[in-house]
């Protein structure tokens, strides 16, 4: 006969209830309190009691992992890929471990952007005081001075930060598929300036200050007997609450509060801020955007807010499985027409790369990214995106519009 851990923990409470139910009014009051306690105990939370400490390394070496020459994350000793279920039946602990590794990956990618891609980290807001919350973007040295071409990269929503397309790909597959580094390196090699946005860095977290409740003053007008009775009830309530908390969350994490970054409190705000303070000031005659997933929505919002400026400065936009919606975002007719001529959305599809895919919305053309995995669409469409930008630039130079509505591998350049 097997007895669950939760049953063993609750057994003393049940026995206690059985014993005190035979007593008088005071004992019945205790029974009521214990019943209330049992009704509020979350058995899933209760199981946290047996979790190992949520104390994880802060370096890749501490996790005993490293990226090999192919950019794959491998265990230093065994050479095996990352294992999520490090401890069986401890999903929450495994998830926290994964998140801790993810934070290290984010810092590692930041280092690669600076050291491997030679980008500089630029703090925003540009006029921030020393004490206020700040974010940052990455730029090539010639981002604002390159007279010809500028490429702007925007990732999707979630835990990803500047330089990443998908954390899952970085951890489980490789750096090439999961980061923006191949785009950055090729862009620099082909003479583009580069700006890497950081649209999910919207706030900083600080520990919530503890609120100290002052006890009632002895000089209160309340009768001493009534005050003593209230204090007794308060102490008993606190005791019951502490008893419950001990089981509910033995590894209670700190309560945090969010301090939002001025003018960068959302991906949409961030895109507009970077446009106003950097992209709009850039010397480049041709600006190109690559925007993945929610990044596409942020670009459409930017266009709604800065339509004339975007039309004047942006030559072409490559979207990858964008989640924008021209109806919900209330994009006007002139914006939809511009997008049809100057944008292309590489969507998740089992069709071959660049095959036309039907669209229900009257916005930009949709073609297959050559994969049905959402997070892989940027990487799989990588060569097609650069070809699209080259064609758009040449078409602009010769005063022609690129025929993006008919893009596929079967269409030759002469037909444009």
Curated annotation (Swiss-Prot):
Q: Which PANTHER family match?
A: COTRANSCRIPTIONAL REGULATOR FAM172A (PTHR21357:SF3), FAM172 FAMILY PROTEIN HOMOLOG CG10038 (PTHR21357)
The UniProt keywords, alphabetically, are: Cytoplasm, Endoplasmic reticulum, mRNA processing, mRNA splicing, Nucleus, Signal
All disulfide bonds of the chain are none
Q: Does the keyword Signal apply?
A: yes
Q: Which InterPro entries match?
A: AB_hydrolase_fold, Arb2, Arb2_dom
Q: Name one GO biological process term.
A: regulatory ncRNA-mediated heterochromatin formation
Where is it mainly found?
A: nucleus
Task: Write down what this protein is called.
Answer: Cotranscriptional regulator ARB2A
- Native species of this protein? Homo sapiens (Human)
Assembly mode: Interacts with AGO2. Found in a complex, composed of AGO2, CHD7 and ARB2A.
Q: Report the active site residues.
A: 293 (nucleophile)
């Amino acid at each position: 006969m097997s007895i669950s851990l939760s049953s063993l923990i609750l057994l003393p409470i049940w026995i206690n209830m059985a014993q005190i139910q035979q007593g008088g009014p005071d004992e019945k009051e205790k029974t009521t309190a214990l019943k209330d306690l049992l009704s509020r105990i979350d058995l899933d939370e209760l199981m946290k009691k047996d979790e190992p400490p949520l104390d994880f390394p802060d370096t890749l070496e501490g996790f005993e992992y490293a990226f090999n020459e192919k950019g794959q994350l491998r265990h230093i000793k065994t050479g095996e890929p990352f294992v999520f279920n490090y401890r069986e039946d401890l999903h929450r602990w495994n998830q926290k471990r994964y998140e801790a590794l993810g934070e290290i990956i984010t810092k590692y990618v930041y280092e690669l952007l600076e050291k491997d891609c030679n980008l500089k980290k630029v703090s925003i807001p540009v006029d921030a005081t020393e004490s206020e919350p700040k974010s940052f973007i990455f730029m090539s040295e010639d981002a604002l001075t390159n007279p010809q071409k500028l490429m702007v990269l925007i990732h999707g929503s979630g835990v990803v930060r500047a330089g990443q397309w998908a954390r899952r790909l970085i951890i489980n597959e490789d750096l090439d598929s999961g980061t923006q580094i191949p785009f950055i390196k090729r862009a620099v090699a082909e003479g583009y300036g580069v700006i890497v946005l950081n649209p999910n860095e919207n706030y900083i977290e600080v520990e919530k200050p503890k609120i100290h409740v002052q006890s009632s003053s002895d000089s209160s007008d309340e009768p001493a007997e009534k005050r003593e009775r209230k204090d007794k009830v308060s102490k008993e309530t606190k005791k019951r609450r502490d008893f419950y908390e001990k089981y509910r969350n033995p590894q209670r994490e700190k309560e945090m509060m969010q301090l939002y970054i001025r003018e960068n409190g959302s991906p949409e705000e961030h895109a507009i801020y970077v446009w106003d303070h950097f992209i709009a000031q850039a010397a480049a005659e041709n600006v190109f955007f690559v925007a993945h997933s929610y990044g596409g929505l942020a670009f459409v919002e930017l266009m709604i807010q800065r339509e004339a400026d975007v039309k004047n400065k942006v030559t072409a936009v490559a979207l990858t499985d964008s989640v924008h919606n021209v109806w919900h975002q209330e994009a006007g007719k002139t914006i939809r027409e511009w997008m049809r001529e100057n944008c292309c959305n590489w969507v998740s599809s089992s069709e071959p790369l660049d095959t036309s895919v039907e669209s229900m919305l009257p916005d930009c053309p949709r073609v297959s990214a050559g994969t049905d995995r959402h997070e892989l669409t940027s990487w799989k469409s990588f060569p097609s995106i650069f070809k699209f930008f080259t064609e758009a630039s040449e078409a602009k130079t010769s005063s022609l519009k690129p025929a993006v509505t008919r893009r596929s591998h079967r269409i030759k350049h002469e037909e444009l």
